[in-house]
C-alpha cells in the first residue's frame, strides 16, 4: 500500500455502509482519518454499523441528518447505490465538499495499476475472462469491485507487479476524481438505470468517467460496433484500441476467417471457444485485447478460452429434468441482457421474467420472442411484460407472485426438448436483496422439481 497522508486527521463522512462502506471506513481509520459513518438503517438492525462503532468510529444511523455536514467534513465517501439527489449529497455538493466512491480510495492507495471494465452488459464475464487470461499469462492479477473482494481491501495488499482488475458500474464511476486505469474497457451502452441517472445521456457520461484521467500512456479498449461508446470515447486521451465482431480492425481485435485476430495476428480459432452465445464474442474480444496489451501470449489466451464456460447467474446451465434444460440468467437485469440470452437458444423456450420497475416498457423484447412458447412473469414489471407478450402474440402468458411459483408454472408449460430460462430483464430489488439471491432461489426451486 502507498504511504498516504492526505486523510490524516481529516473528518471524513462515509455515507452508507454495506460491504464497500465498511471497507472504506476501516481503511480510512487505518490511514489516520476521523471517520463518521452514516447509514439509513437503524443501529439496532445494523450489524456492520455496530462493528464500526466498536472500533471507535462515530456512527449515526436511522437517517441522513444534514447536521453531519457541519462537522468540518473534508470528504464524503458514498455507497454507489445512494443517488446524488439525496438531500445530504445535494447539500455536500453546495458546500463544495468532494464526493467519491470506494473505488477512488482504492486507486489512491494502490501500488498496482488498475484495469477498469464498464458497460451496460457483459462486465462480469469480461472481467472474469480478463482475470483468467492474466492469471494464465502469469501477470499476477487480483480481482476487485462488483465481483470478488471490495476494491479498497484488495488495493491495500496489491503489489507493484500485480494488476487490479475491476468491474465498474456507472454508480461507482460517478464518484471518481483521480482514478486513472492503465487500461479502461467500455463494452456497450444502452438505456438503463434511468431511475438513477434520468437520461441515457447522463448514464453514458457517468460511464465515460472511466476515461476521465487517462493519458497517452494509457489504453482505452472500445467497442467499434456501438455508436454511443464510440462517441463517448472522445473523452479519452488514451491510446484507443477498437474491437468489432462485424468488421475487420487492423490495429485492434476482430473476427475473420472464423478466428479471432489482434493487430493482424491470429490468436484463437472460434471453434476452440467453449463459452456459448454470439454476444460473448464481444466480451472475449475485449478481454483478449486487454490481455494482449499486457503481454499475455496467444497460447495462454487459447488455454483459457478452451475451458472457460461462463460465470454464475449468467446463462448458467442448472440441470436437465425430463429432457427440459434449465438455465439461470438472473444477472440479466435489463432488456439487452435478456435479448442476448434469448438469441442464444434455437429450441422452444419458456421464459421467466420480471422484477423491479424502472419505468421502461418491454416492447424491445418482442422481436426476440420468436422461439418463446410461453412466458411466466413475476415482480413489479409483470403487467408490462404481459403487455409485451400479448403484442408478440404469445399463446401462453401467466403471472404469479413468487419465483418459486414461476418455476412450477414454467415446468407445467414445457414439453420434451424445451429450454426453461430465467432471464428477468429487470433488477431484483423489488423481491430480492441481489440478483445472486434471485438466481440461487431459482436453482433451489428447480431442484425441488426433481
From Swiss-Prot:
Disulfide bonds: none
Subcellular location: Cytoplasm
Catalytic activity: UDP-N-acetyl-alpha-D-muramoyl-L-alanine + D-glutamate + ATP = UDP-N-acetyl-alpha-D-muramoyl-L-alanyl-D-glutamate + ADP + phosphate + H(+)
EC number: 6.3.2.9
SUPFAM superfamilies per UniProt: MurCD N-terminal domain, MurD-like peptide ligases, catalytic domain, MurD-like peptide ligases, peptide-binding domain
Domain of life from the UniProt record: Bacteria
Entry's Gene Ontology cellular component terms: cytoplasm
Keyword Cell wall biogenesis/degradation included in the entry's annotation: yes
Pathway entry: Cell wall biogenesis; peptidoglycan biosynthesis
Main location: cytoplasm
Biological processes, Gene Ontology terms: cell division; cell wall organization; peptidoglycan biosynthetic process; regulation of cell shape
Record family assignment: Belongs to the MurCDEF family.
Protein name: UDP-N-acetylmuramoylalanine--D-glutamate ligase
Amino acid at each position: 500500500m502507498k504511504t498516504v497522508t492526505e486523510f490524516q486527521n481529516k473528518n471524513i463522512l462515509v455515507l452508507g455502509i454495506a460491504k464497500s462502506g465498511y471497507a472504506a471506513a476501516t481503511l480510512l481509520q487505518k490511514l489516520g482519518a476521523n471517520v463518521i459513518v452514516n447509514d439509513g438503517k437503524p443501529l439496532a438492525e445494523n450489524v456492520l454499523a455496530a462493528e464500526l462503532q466498536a472500533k471507535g468510529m462515530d456512527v449515526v444511523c436511522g437517517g441522513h441528518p444534514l447536521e453531519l455536514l457541519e462537522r468540518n467534513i473534508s470528504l464524503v465517501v458514498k455507497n454507489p447505490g445512494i443517488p446524488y439527489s439525496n438531500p445530504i449529497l445535494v447539500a455536500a455538493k453546495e458546500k463544495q465538499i468532494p464526493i467519491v466512491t470506494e473505488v477512488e480510495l482504492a486507486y489512491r492507495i494502490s501500488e498496482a495499476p488498475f484495469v477498469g471494465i464498464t458497460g451496460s452488459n457483459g462486465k462480469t464475464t469480461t472481467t472474469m475472462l480478463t482475470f483468467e487470461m492474466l492469471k494464465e499469462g502469469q501477470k499476477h492479477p487480483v480481482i476487485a469491485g462488483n465481483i470478488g473482494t471490495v476494491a479498497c481491501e484488495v488495493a491495500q495488499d496489491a503489489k507493484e507487479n500485480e494488476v487490479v482488475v475491476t468491474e465498474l458500474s456507472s454508480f461507482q464511476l460517478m464518484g471518481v476524481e483521480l482514478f486513472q486505469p492503465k487500461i479502461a474497457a467500455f463494452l456497450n451502452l444502452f438505456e438503463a438505470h434511468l431511475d438513477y441517472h434520468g437520461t441515457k445521456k447522463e448514464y453514458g457520461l457517468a460511464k465515460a468517467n472511466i476515461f476521465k484521467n487517462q493519458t497517452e500512456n494509457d489504453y482505452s479498449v472500445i467497442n467499434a460496433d456501438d455508436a454511443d461508446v464510440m462517441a463517448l470515447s472522445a473523452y479519452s486521451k488514451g491510446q484507443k484500441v477498437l474491437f468489432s465482431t462485424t468488421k475487420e480492425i487492423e490495429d485492434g481485435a476482430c473476427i475473420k476467417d472464423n478466428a479471432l485476430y489482434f493487430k493482424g495476428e491470429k490468436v484463437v480459432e472460434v471453434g476452440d471457444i467453449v463459452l456459448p452465445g454470439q454476444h460473448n464474442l464481444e466480451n472475449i474480444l475485449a478481454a483478449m485485447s486487454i490481455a494482449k496489451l499486457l503481454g499475455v501470449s496467444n497460447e495462454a489466451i487459447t488455454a483459457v478460452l478452451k475451458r472457460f464456460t461462463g460465470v454464475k447467474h449468467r446463462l448458467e446451465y442448472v440441470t436437465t429434468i425430463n429432457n427440459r434444460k434449465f438455465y439461470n440468467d438472473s444477472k440479466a437485469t435489463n432488456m439487452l441482457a435478456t435479448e442476448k440470452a434469448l438469441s442464444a437458444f434455437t429450441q422452444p423456450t419458456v421464459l421467466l421474467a420480471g422484477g423491479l420497475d424502472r419505468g421502461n416498457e418491454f416492447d424491445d423484447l418482442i422481436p426476440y420472442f420468436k422461439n418463446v412458447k410461453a412466458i411466466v412473469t413475476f415482480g413489479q414489471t409483470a403487467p408490462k411484460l404481459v403487455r409485451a407478450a400479448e403484442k408478440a402474440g404469445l399463446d401462453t402468458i401467466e403471472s404469479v407472485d413468487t419465483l418459486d411459483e414461476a418455476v412450477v408454472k414454467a415446468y407445467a408449460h414445457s414439453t420434451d426438448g424445451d429450454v426453461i430460462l430465467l432471464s428477468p430483464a429487470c433488477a431484483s430489488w423489488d423481491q430480492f436483496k441481489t440478483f445472486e439471491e434471485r438466481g440461487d432461489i431459482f436453482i433451489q426451486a428447480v431442484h425441488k422439481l426433481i
